[in-house]
Amino acid sequence: MLEDYYPSTTSYYHGGIDDDLYTAKWGMVMTFLDLNDSSLTPFEGTHFALIGFKSDKGVYINNGRVGAVESPAAIRTQLAKFPWHLGNQVMVYDVGNIDGPNRSLEQLQNSLSKAIKRMCDLNLKPIVLGGGHETAYGHYLGLRQSLSPSDDLAVINMDAHFDLRPYDQTGPNSGTGFRQMFDDAVADKRLFKYFVLGIQEHNNNLFLFDFVAKSKGIQFLTGQDIYQMGHQKVCRAIDRFLEGQERVYLTIDMDCFSVGAAPGVSAIQSLGVDPNLAVLVLQHIAASGKLVGFDVVEVSPPHDIDNHTANLAATFIFYLVQIMAQHS
């Protein structure tokens, strides 16, 4: 039995029901699935599993604005309203949440990793609704556990921050997940392939830039780089990064986008990547056929305005799933 795991029992769609897939919405089509059901066998074809990670403990430890614990419900509500474009050959299952208000951050990350591995064993592509960016380490661990030790797993992070902070004194938090991945790779004598899109210089200290400069395998583009390059050159840079890689894990921190597009985040951003450009880049990553799982994190509903940020996060999920279904 999976720990800290609660299957979904309540629909987030409250509109009319229509059996016609040409007019259906996500909330009509998505089906509940209990990962603890021992009778389940691996699914055939391309299907997705949506799980919430109800934790912003890492944000609290990192002195950010808490509230991301409420994000899975907010994103589900927005996603449920979107039109269904996936026909009858692709299914998105809502498998519930990882939740444990009295559990430690490390315990919740471990529980998420086991749920992710369970999804992969069932041939379901994971979509995780954070949660703070501590979500990423649990998601990554689960993906790695589903692979053999020699298998590669590159990481693309759309984020204003490197999230490579040391954690020997503070302990793990929302800003340390990728340093934990890096340290795991060093311990296993693997190269950590990590590409950050949307870095803002005013959000990262010189220690982090120095660490990146000295670390083989880590690349980044600033938000200003992306603005100047345009999406086609950014996509070519991603292609070069993914050359020779068979798998990539994608994580989207909603503070990558300006406060005008994403006001409800743990750490607001005055600058930021254009969401329209981001959609084109995300679709390109999905079209590589290498994307094995993704998450959207750091949505903070108590700080959102008219669900702008939750809706944008749901929009990214809509387009990523659409392209992944075509290229898997």
Swiss-Prot record:
The keyword Glycoprotein does not apply. Binds 2 manganese ions per subunit. One of its GO terms (biological process) is L-histidine catabolic process to glutamate and formate. Pathway: Amino-acid degradation; L-histidine degradation into L-glutamate; L-glutamate from N-formimidoyl-L-glutamate (hydrolase route): step 1/1. It holds the Pfam family Arginase. Its EC number is 3.5.3.8. One of its GO terms (molecular function) is formimidoylglutamase activity. It comes from the Bacteria. Keywords: Histidine metabolism, Hydrolase, Manganese, Metal-binding. Transmembrane segments: none annotated. Mn(2+) 1 binds at H133, D159, D163, D253. Mn(2+) 2 binds at D159, H161, D253, D255. It catalyses: N-formimidoyl-L-glutamate + H2O = formamide + L-glutamate. InterPro entries: HutG (IPR005923), Ureohydrolase (IPR006035), Ureohydrolase_dom_sf (IPR023696). Its cofactor is Mn(2+). Belongs to the arginase family. PANTHER family: ARGINASE/AGMATINASE, FORMIMIDOYLGLUTAMASE. Catalyzes the conversion of N-formimidoyl-L-glutamate to L-glutamate and formamide. This is Formimidoylglutamase. It comes from Streptococcus pyogenes serotype M1. The lineage of its organism: Bacteria, Bacillati, Bacillota, Bacilli, Lactobacillales.
